[in-house]
Amino acid sequence: MTDKRAVILLSGGLDSATVVAMAKAEGYACYTMSFDYGQRHRAELDAAARVARDLGVVEHKVIGLNLNGIGGSALTDNSIDVPEAPGEGIPVTYVPARNTVFLSLALGWAEVLEARDIFIGVNAVDYSGYPDCRPEFVEAFERMANLATKAGVEGQGFRIQAPLQNLSKAQIVQAGIAQGVDYSLTVSCYQADDEGRACGKCDSCRLRADGFKAAGVEDPTRYF
């Protein structure tokens, strides 16, 4: 396999759609991976499929996980309400170890594909404070990936790429628009209904709306 391949985590939201477009612009053959992990906002899976089709990825996988069997998050446990006001500390929408689990499965697929690059749309500027979105986490996972895999041990190192890490939400929107991302296809809301309409109140909705406003770009989000 000689082409330039990348595995990209695609949630169906604004950030991950932007990352797919950026990777494609860099000449990568894009293989996207989404997760049906018991999240309450399952409309994002439909959004991920739409984005994958629109951006012409080579293959799109949806992996089933039962993270709601663990619970501990407002996104996987319906007995915990999604907060609709900003709070302090790490919010209850944090899903324990989610990005570690997702990246581990992406790493496995990348090794099978002989891809050396894995992209993730984490951000540490306009974000909710999740610990697994920080640069330190990304760097640590890359070190682990190259210790834990046959490819890494044999010197065919993996790179975990987080191109949005230091961008504001407005800069992310502008980058996506420059690459032709159709943000009307995406779903960011933690409480999106089955049609992908947003609540307009959760932290993810606030960050998204503020990003479009600051970027001077019309927000295509539909609300219920």
Curated annotation (Swiss-Prot):
Provide the residue positions that the database annotates as binding Zn(2+).
C189, C199, C202, C205
The cofactor note from the UniProt entry for this protein is: Binds 1 zinc ion per subunit.
Top-rank EC class of the record's enzyme: ligase
Q: Which CDD domains match?
A: QueC-like
The biological pathway it contributes to is:
Purine metabolism; 7-cyano-7-deazaguanine biosynthesis
- Cofactor(s), names only, from the UniProt record: Zn(2+)
Keywords attached to this Swiss-Prot or TrEMBL record, sorted alphabetically, are: ATP-binding, Ligase, Metal-binding, Nucleotide-binding, Queuosine biosynthesis, Zinc
> Would you identify the family this protein belongs to, as annotated?
Belongs to the QueC family.
The record lists the catalysed reaction(s) as: 7-carboxy-7-deazaguanine + NH4(+) + ATP = 7-cyano-7-deazaguanine + ADP + phosphate + H2O + H(+)
One Pfam entry name: QueC
What the protein does?
A: Catalyzes the ATP-dependent conversion of 7-carboxy-7-deazaguanine (CDG) to 7-cyano-7-deazaguanine (preQ(0)).
Under the heading InterPro entries, the entry gives:
QueC (IPR018317), Rossmann-like_a/b/a_fold (IPR014729)
Give GO terms: molecular function aspect only.
Answer: ATP binding; ligase activity, forming carbon-nitrogen bonds; zinc ion binding
Per the UniProt entry, the Enzyme Commission number(s) are 6.3.4.20
Keyword rRNA-binding among UniProt keywords: no
Q: What is the lineage of its organism?
A: Bacteria, Pseudomonadati, Pseudomonadota, Gammaproteobacteria, Pseudomonadales
For the biological process aspect of GO, one term held by this record is:
queuosine biosynthetic process
What is the name attached to this protein's record?
Answer: 7-cyano-7-deazaguanine synthase
Could you name the domain of life of the organism this protein comes from?
A: Bacteria
**HAMAP family in the record:** QueC
Q: What does the entry list as the binding residues for ATP?
A: L10, S11, G12, G13, L14, D15, S16, A17, T18, V19, V20
